[in-house]
Amino acid sequence: MLNAVGRDIPEEILKLTGKEVFQGNHHFDGYEYKKQGPKTKCVINSNGSKLVENIHEVLVQCGIKDGMTVSFHHHFRDGDYVVNMVMKEIHDMGIKDITICASSLGKAHDPLVEYIEDGTITNIQSSGVRGKIGEAISQGKLKGLAIMRSHGGRVRAIESGETQIDIAFIGTPTCDEYGNCRGIGGKSDCGVLSYAMADAYHADKVVAITDTLVPFPNFPAHISMTKVDYVVVVDEIGNPQKIATGAAKPTTDMRKLMMADYCTQFVVNSPYFKDGFSYQTGVGGASIASTISLAKIMKERNIRMRFGVGGLTKPMCDLLINDQVDVLLDTQDFDLAAVESVKNLRHFRISAGEYANPFNKGAVVNKLDFVILAALEVDVNFNCNVVVGSDGMLTGAQGGHPDTAAGAKCAIVIAPLLQGRIPAICTDVTTVTTPGESVDVVVTDYGIAINPRRQDLIEAMKDVDLPFKTIEELRDIAYSIAGEPQKVEFGDRIVGIIESRDGTIMDVVREIKPFEFAEDKKQKKSKSK
């Protein structure tokens, strides 16, 4: 069945998942539903401690068994130790058929591939998967389905009861013996625990895992003792030095700096750039650079930002230090400067639900003026792909990309015309993660394209000295340089789905075919005749 972005979703997947095809961003606007209530228990006159000796013992007390769903957050990014620690113990206990519901999985979790291959892990729900896990899923090694959700979509799935978490494991930099968790004050600080809040509120059992036990009460708690069943103290939960990795670092690349300048010039010439505007930037190097250049213009023109949202990095936190923004609203910290900034009284932590859940009574993303994002591919319909590489491998994460693009008044995507020798601006993206109706502007190193849906922006920019082109012109330039890319050859088996933030199916991910040389293909064809 064709969905609103023209992707054919097989009936078998619709039946298997019980989901509908994506029918546009506003299909569920005004929809009313009853949230799933969490399971809890009465604790009256307990011994005053929830401490359990180790991971094995807490798994026993939680009643771990085959077929359960366990959850994790990714606030430590590539420095996370908790997922591997817990899953190794589950594996060693001989437990099978586990579903992992993680806010994201990265290269730090490569050891999970062994557990995918032996059936310990059979289903994965995540914002994205990088490294060897993505390769394993794309190669068909996961027995069940990988469901990729946005940050807001994940909260929706948990709160609605679509995803029922049996045990939530929350790595927390500090915790007291009664379960009050904070993202700061320890030796492995990550800043906030926003992605874990929905898990803590809705999981049947909640386990706090810390390497810094502090005296009661550990206030103000990011996650309250009223949600936590058990506390386990381990040697290390993560390496905060690895929070800022890869895309989360500032760039010195001249091409990316040029795109950042184009982006900034577009922002400051748009009708939304005025005193009291709101802003979020992605984690890409060009996006971070655009924030730095924007700060200079804000100072020159005496324009103040009302609030910044994130995923936060040092340049956004510098705006707070320099008193150029009133407040920051934080769901994740991408570097240690952002972690430190959490201590600022005008730096507020918010939950992932407050940030981006489309199935509540209004999330922060709906109040954004600008969001600056990145993409692996953008097609001529402005659809974006941020999850599947041009080789067909799962290699990225939806994150808040679809959420912020849908909510912001002006969603700007920065992408180089070519990713290596592969056109990033193309006729059709490999996989749709963010629909073109959400994307207003695409900034490349060869020019800027405004979505024809946004005639107001086209009119506002008619006298601005920037290299404007149509998206088709950008595609044609890319193809003239590198040629039209050959489509990736996929097998028939569907190994994953790209879920829209509203829970419908945006696209599917198929198993990739092993590479074959042309001569080998010819020989196979001749033998089959």
Give the label of every model feature segment.
Residues 1-529:
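Conserved alpha/beta enzyme-core scaffold
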